[in-house]
Amino acid sequence: MGLWLVLANQVGLVGTLVLVVCFTPANSLVRPLLLPGITALVSYGLILNKEAIANAGAWSLVNLNTAGLFLQYLDVGLISRWTYSAYGPTSSRGGQPNASLDLAGRKKPPSSSLLSRLQWGFSTATSWRAPSTVWEAKGTPHFEELPSRGRFLARNAMTLLWSVLVLDVMGLVGGDLDPVANAAHFTWDRVRFLARLGDVSRDEVILRATVVYMRWGAMYFSLQVVYSFLAIVFVMVGLSPVQRWPPLFGSFTEIYTLRNTWGKAWHQLIRQKVSSPAHYTTYSLLGLRKGGIAGRYTCILATFFVSGLLHLFCAEYSYGIQWDQSGTLRFYSIQALGIAMEDAVQATSRRLFAYRSTYWTRAIGYVWVLLWFLWTSPAYFFPLLKYDTEKRPPVLLGPIETWLQSRHVQ
């Protein structure tokens, strides 16, 4: 019964959003009046997800979608104010690309039929990057060449299997979870690094690096599994075309700066959702000047702060981590500081040394990014690891693990 309620909650959120963007004018009072109801549905959904879904990883993903739909409503319903008649956003207050296009420069709705409206509304509610449209989120990767439907399905099936296999291997290499060891190794004191650098042992550095980089790898492949699975289902049954499912991640050759890492290499699924309220707060509420240093970095900080709130509800909330033990907001907020630091270094280098990008500067950049995440990521990961006591059985390598265990016993 609980899972059916979870599904009903998701349908209610998506359905409300679809009806709002399809059938209400941009400035309709219905839109803000529905916000308390959306907030109540999301709050109930976060509680319901935890009670109905046993696997912590699964309910984290469902929580991400639940809280993400709240941000989606804020953006397309209230800030950017999408409508079917405009076939897109009607306001640029959320920093939406091309929102200022007049109606003559926009793609026209194919028809005014109910089915056409609902299809567009469903796409608007669920395609958070708005790929292959003029409203596409900045940094969204593209196909090198648009594949045929069959090739797309085959490629995503291989990606899905490969990603699951890698996660299985990572699970086997990681071994059994030891709650006692986790509680000792991943305390909040261990998050602090530079302040106690003289007391940090080589073994702790190795453990820290192993955990940080493996957790980022696990997040990468976990997101790829979900994305490839949904892409296969939606394209196979005809709910969306191939062009609505471009690659999830960009090129990891771009991770020589933090700005590129977050804006090009990592997924952009929530970029518009978290940047819209940040853009609105910075430039509409605070009235800071666009293009100014204060406005630019306030908006970056606000964007990462909103992203931190989203990840807090989808991850830490799932594990029951107390607020005073939480590091998610700290991790995401400090990324703005890192970007400001590297911007300052690059600007100074350009003025003093005629800086230009070379193989050597990129090599230094890769090291910088790896060290930055080695320093900052434990604030995000260690509280989760401390409370993570769930052994996740391998999906593909389960029989192999069983055979290895039987040989070990013999």
UniProtKB/Swiss-Prot annotation:
Residues 90-112 are annotated as: Disordered. Keywords: Acyltransferase, Glycoprotein, Membrane, Transferase, Transmembrane, Transmembrane helix. Pathway: Polyketide biosynthesis. Its EC number is 2.3.1.-. It is a multi-pass membrane protein. The keyword Transmembrane applies. It is found in: Membrane. The chain crosses the membrane at residues 3-23, 28-48, 59-79, 157-177, 219-239, 300-320, 364-384. Belongs to the wax synthase family. PANTHER family: LONG-CHAIN-ALCOHOL O-FATTY-ACYLTRANSFERASE 3-RELATED (PTHR31595), WAX SYNTHASE DOMAIN-CONTAINING PROTEIN-RELATED (PTHR31595:SF27). Acetyltransferase; part of the gene cluster that mediates the biosynthesis of aurovertins, fungal polyketides that exhibit potent inhibition of adenosine triphosphate synthase. This is Acetyltransferase aurG. It comes from Calcarisporium arbuscula.
